[in-house]
Regions:
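Beta-strand-dominated extracellular/periplasmic modules and repeats
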Residues: 21-140
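Sec-dependent bacterial lipoprotein signal peptides
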Residues: 1-19
């Protein structure tokens, strides 16, 4: 076998072996609950953004989420993130969201006040508390 073929074969093996390594990512999960009574937010999504990365995870019926770049739970690159949380009942046939379950301040990372840092020696679980929507004034 020529030197070039050996090099290419070794490179392929190295790439295949490293594909399973997750040195720069961490599995991250957590739960979203309401600040007033501790009950879980059971519908919605958690989205985290850094300058270059966006990860997300859907909430399950107990308010739990697993984060990932491509799929829920595939891991989060190390770094500092701003967090936003979406929570509404379901999308209406008109395409508009249904009833909002959380305060609108949580919809945008720059307004939510929620952040977290993912690092190799840091926590792997991040729990968030959200407020219910503020009451709307009724016009008479």
């Amino acid at each position: 076998m020529s030197g070039a073929k050996v090099y290419c074969a070794a490179l392929v093996v190295l790439v295949l072996l490293s594909a399973g390594c997750n040195g720069s990512k961490m599995k991250v999960s957590g739960q979203v609950t309401f600040s007033d009574d501790g009950s879980p937010l059971t519908v919605g999504m958690v989205v985290m953004e850094s300058g270059t990365t966006r990860v997300s995870g859907k909430l399950d019926g107990k308010g739990n989420f697993r984060l990932g770049e491509l799929d829920d739970g595939d891991g989060v690159p190390f770094g500092e993130y701003k967090v936003c949380i979406a929570g509404c009942r379901e999308t209406l046939p008109s395409g508009f969201p249904g009833e909002y379950l959380i305060d609108s301040k949580f919809e945008r990372p720059e307004h939510s006040g929620l952040t977290f840092v993912v690092k190799s020696d840091g926590p792997k679980t991040f729990d968030f508390k959200v407020d219910r929507p503020t009451k709307k004034l009724k016009l008479k």
